[in-house]
């Protein structure tokens, strides 16, 4: 049947991007377009719930915002989940963010989802699902302790 992790992103404890993992495979990631009219500081929490059936180790995450590398910290690791966090400062009206475990160009074109977040109008949209089934939860009601950003 193949390996399938679960991958979610929590943004500022208010927005959840759910099911960003591929339908099958050991890779996870997405492309975000964030629109903002002023400076914003976003705290992102990346939650990976691994499928241990065919792997021994979870791949790390790489994050780029407008082609600049973003520091990602592993903050928690259990058998059930791995949590990374990053802080992104939005200075431009439009910010492109790439989040991935494998940066193969083909994955961004045809597999990883593409999501648009308009912070001005509070309109959030999945632009392209590709090889995943993402959805956006806003406002976020954390149903697991590790989803809370306190």
Swiss-Prot record:
GO BP, sorted A to Z: symbiont-mediated suppression of host innate immune response; viral process
InterPro entries linked to this entry: Poxvirus_C7/F8A
One protein family per Pfam: Pox_C7_F8A
Keyword Cell membrane (UniProt): no
Record's keyword annotation contains Methyltransferase: no
Keywords: Early protein, Host-virus interaction, Inhibition of host innate immune response by virus, Viral immunoevasion
Induction: Expressed in the early phase of the viral replicative cycle.
Similarity comment text for this entry: Belongs to the orthopoxvirus OPG027 family.
Its job: Inhibits antiviral activity induced by type I interferons. Does not block signal transduction of IFN, but is important to counteract the host antiviral state induced by a pre-treatment with IFN.
Name under which the protein is recorded: Interferon antagonist OPG027
Name of the gene encoding the protein in the UniProt record: OPG027
């Amino acid at each position: 049947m193949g390996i399938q992790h679960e991958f979610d992103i929590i943004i500022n404890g208010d927005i959840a991007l759910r099911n960003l993992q591929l339908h099958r495979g050991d890779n996870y990631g997405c492309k975000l377009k964030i629109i903002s009219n002023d400076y914003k500081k976003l705290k992102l929490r990346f939650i990976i719930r691994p499928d241990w059936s065919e792997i021994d180790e979870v791949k790390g995450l790489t994050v780029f915002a407008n082609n600049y590398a973003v520091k990602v910290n592993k903050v928690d690791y259990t058998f059930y989940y791995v949590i990374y966090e990053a802080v992104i400062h939005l200075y431009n009206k439009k910010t492109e963010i790439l989040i991935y475990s494998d940066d193969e160009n083909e994955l961004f074109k045809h597999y990883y989802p593409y999501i648009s977040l308009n912070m001005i109008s509070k309109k959030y949209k999945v632009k392209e699902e590709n090889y995943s089934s993402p959805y956006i939860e806003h406002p976020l009601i954390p149903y697991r302790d590790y989803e809370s950003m306190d």
